[in-house]
Amino acid sequence: MGIIELKNIVKTFPSEKVGEGVHAVKNVSLSIEEGDIFGIIGYSGAGKSTLVRCINLLESPTSGEVLVEGKNITAYSEAQLRAVRRRMGMIFQHFNLLNSANVFENVAAPLKNQRRFTKDEIEEKRAELRKDSSLSEKEIKEKEKALLKSNKKLSGKEIKERVEEMLRLTGLEDKARAYPSQLSGGQKQRVAIARALVGKPKILLCDEATSALDPNTTTQIIELLRSLQEKLKLTVVMITHQMEVVKSICNKVAVMEDGKVIEEGSLVEVFSEPKSSTTKEFREKTLYRKEALALTEKNRRNLYELTFIGEKANDPAIMELVRTYPVEVSILFGNIEILSGVPFGTLTIDMKGEGKDILDAVAYLKSREIKVEELGGHRIEGFSGEENDSCRGQNPEYYKNTERSEEVKIDDELREEDKIWNG
């Protein structure tokens, strides 16, 4: 069982214009394992942000179950949910910092009135004591009493130590007394990350955390999140519409469209063998498919995309191909990267020669366990070269009903963060 289990989650928002309401999430089931960096990707209006808010019950599902560490939290009281939310950090697209507070005070904010242990942690520690066969019943009771007595609010010293640790981990040691107005966008997001993790959560939820950042800063934040995930043993859920973000950090991914999960699996599986048109669109945005198709339309070339996974990324197949078969091969585009620790390479080639020789060459490549896909050329019947609508699959009614100004979105996020910290 995963650390997070979503079972048949449905979320419907009431709407005066739509009689049955707006179905933002439709019967979604997902299992997220401990230690995963799980990406949920989709276009605007796909339902991904609503889904992630169902994980910590900032949005209560209309139906379905949310299990965290095996416990169905949809049945929890508000008091129980407060304890659960403290074990789930969350960062948003907007940084939501307190402008009148410095960096240290912003990071320390969630620790106000926090005790050393949650009720669940107390129960876990009591269970560990009772499993210790070396302790007598009297000793167990004495230790339980001492445990409960020690569960006081965090002292000023403890808060200071925690905040300083998070500032060090996020590279903000020299910014403790700075105010938000003195920080760059990337530094503000680092403060938000430190604040989300200062309570020592096991789970970090990221809702479009890099969308407001430039590419260089996005890369830095992704590297920071990866480092923190390893050091703090976090389970991370990444909500994004950016395939580059998913490729850079996630080991698993789910693709959402119109409130449904249409595809999921390991990053390598989903990226190398996309099944849905939406997933293919996301994939093509990170390759040179558009440029290759333009060349095909202009010059009627025989273009092929070759995919190399794992050890095959080092395979000298092209060199051996031209030595063995009477064909000419031109490499138009090429790329190799590491996806979740696995080498993943693509080549777009133009192949010239007699029809039979080209077919034999393609068969040879496939025999080397290289995926070969025709992109276009005079041998492909019915090829139109038309590009798909980049927004296909969105739920326009949902997007229209949930479209808000940036100011209102920020207000919503502030309320949600207050709910996480204070219930």
Model-identified regions with their sequence ranges:
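ABC ATPase NBD coupling module
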Residues: 19, 73-89, 113, 154-161, ...
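Conserved ABC transporter NBD signature motif
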Residues: 64-72, 120, 124
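Conserved signature/switch motifs of ABC ATPase nucleotide-binding domains
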Residues: 178-181, 199
